[in-house]
Amino acid sequence: MSNELTEIDEVVTSSQEEATQRDPVLDWFLTHCHLHKYPAKSTLIHAGEDATTLYYVIKGSVMVSSKDDEGKEMILTYLGAGQFFGEAGLFDEGSKRSAWVKTKTTCEIAEISYKKYRQLIQANPEILMFLTAQLARRLQNTSRQVTNLAFLDVAGRIAQTLMNLAKQPEAMTHPDGMQIKITRQEIGQMVGCSRETVGRIIKMLEDQNLIHAHGKTIVVYGAR
């Protein structure tokens, strides 16, 4: 287990990089968007509704999730500043939303209709590269997640999830690593296990001096 938190450094850090490396083309794109501010826990996308709009996170973070027929929620990912979402309908005209998207924190979101975005592509095809580059990285991350589900035990999945979260923009620098805020239930929804199991694994990681947990606050030692 001691290697699981140190060997996971290849996971997603793109949202941090993109948030601090704004490109002039991206700034041009944002001038054509409608900008909105949302409080935490606002629902931006409902699964099953028509897909007509592309979103871009300027500040804050959002949670992407799905629900089974019984209403049980599974957290698919968190997206932070510099990330697009709601793009599937852009390539599959007439499709319905397949997931729920809610703000995790207070957010500033840029929104643009698919029709307008396609017009921008005609004016400057480079704007499409921002989106396709992210989609390529997400596909890699999804492949990694599937591999983890197949080969890592639940303790390994939780350890990797904590390291992933420690690399998100809203994670706070701590003298011993990075500090995150997340509930046991949310972790369970991300890795596919019960809240009680998460609690036991968190305690085990603490005993191994890999993390420190107090309520929703978790310090991941050695993460930067």
Swiss-Prot record:
Organism expressing this protein natively: Haemophilus influenzae (strain ATCC 51907 / DSM 11121 / KW20 / Rd)
Record GO biological process: establishment of competence for transformation
Inducing factors: Constitutively expressed; slightly induced on shifting to starvation media.
PROSITE patterns: CNMP_BINDING_1, CNMP_BINDING_2, CNMP_BINDING_3, HTH_CRP_1, HTH_CRP_2
Residues carrying N6-acetyllysine: 115
Short name of one Pfam family: cNMP_binding
Binding site for 3',5'-cyclic AMP 1: 71-77, 86-88, 97-98, 142-143
GO CC annotation: cytosol
Binding site for 3',5'-cyclic AMP 2: 150-151, 185-195
Keywords, ordered alphabetically: Acetylation, Activator, cAMP, cAMP-binding, Competence, DNA-binding, Nucleotide-binding, Transcription, Transcription regulation
Primary role: A global transcription regulator required for bacterial competence. Complexes with cyclic AMP (cAMP) which allosterically activates DNA binding (to consensus sequence 5'-AAATGTGATCTAGATCACATTT-3') to regulate transcription at 54 promoters. There are 2 consensus subclasses; CRP-N (above) and CRP-S (T6 changed to C and A17 changed to G) which obligatorily also requires Sxy for expression. CRP-S sites bind DNA but do not activate transcription in the absence of Sxy. Probably induces a severe bend in DNA.
UniProt-annotated site: Activating region 2 (AR2), residues: 111, 116
SMART domains xref list: cNMP, HTH_CRP
Recorded domain comment: The N-terminal domain binds cAMP and is responsible for homodimerization, while the C-terminal domain binds DNA when cAMP is bound.
Gene3D superfamilies with a match to the protein in the record: Jelly Rolls (2.60.120.10), Winged helix-like DNA-binding domain superfamily/Winged helix DNA-binding domain (1.10.10.10)
Residue ranges, annotated region (Activating region 3 (AR3)): 67-73
InterPro entries listed in its UniProt record: cNMP-bd_CS (IPR018488), cNMP-bd_dom (IPR000595), cNMP-bd_dom_sf (IPR018490), Env_Response_Regulators (IPR050397), HTH_CRP (IPR012318), RmlC-like_jellyroll (IPR014710), Tscrpt_reg_HTH_Crp-type_CS (IPR018335), WH-like_DNA-bd_sf (IPR036388)
Residues making up the signal peptide according to the UniProt record: none
Subunit architecture: Homodimer, which upon binding cAMP is able to bind DNA. Binds RNA polymerase subunit RpoA.
DNA-binding feature ranges: 194-200
Name of the featured protein: cAMP-activated global transcriptional regulator CRP
UniProt key word Glycosyltransferase: no
Stretch list, region Activating region 1 (AR1): 168-177
Disruption phenotype: Loss of competence, the ability to bind, take-up and integrate exogenous DNA. Loss of the ability to ferment ribose or xylose.
Boundaries of every HTH crp-type domain copy: 152-224
Start and end residues of each stretch annotated as Activating region 2 (AR2): 34-36
MF (Gene Ontology): cAMP binding; DNA binding; DNA-binding transcription factor activity
